[in-house]
């Protein structure tokens, strides 16, 4: 019996030693673009980031309602952004409740998915090509809607009349913007307010189709 038990243990040791890469998996921070756009769950995760950025409750300003930034209500969280806004903390260079950076980050997630997450490289259903096609059509529609949503959020906060009296919109993000491109501030011009609205409506129409 001892010989049998010893043989089993020895065989097990050889089994594990022979498979060095059995548990050789990648941790999250080692996953690159080539992995992201091959694995359907990871690809969809990029798009879902744009969903996660949407406020899901009315008191989304650091647990405060936006009314706390006016005379309608008062907050006792003096370190919050709405308190700073109420106390006159808004300047041309600092908006305590601004969503500029966050919204454009969300748009980058959407555009990255539109450019990479709908190709033949990623399969959302490996057994039925027709189902895979339908899933991609649905995800494409969601992407266009999310792009319209985030442009609308930016337009609400930053669109309006300029010094010359013309109604201006916001810089349109119709593609993935790299860090190098983002550093070229002169490349991003504000179109007219109507042009921004037209862009949003066009994306909504694409989402419907």
Please place each PLM-identified region on the residue numbering.
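Sec-dependent signal peptide recognition
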Residues: 2-9
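Aromatic-residue-lined binding/catalytic grooves and analogous aromatic/hydrophobic interfacial grooves
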Residues: 19-24, 201-208
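Membrane-proximal, proline-rich intrinsically disordered regions
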Residues: 19-70
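Conserved, well-structured interaction surfaces
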Residues: 44, 80-160, 186-196, 206-209
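Secretory-pathway/luminal and periplasmic proteins that interact with or process carbohydrate-rich
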Residues: 55-62, 74-75, 150-162
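Short, flexible, mixed-charge acidic loops at enzyme active sites
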Residues: 162-179
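Substrate-binding clefts and substrate-entry loops adjacent to catalytic sites
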Residues: 178-188
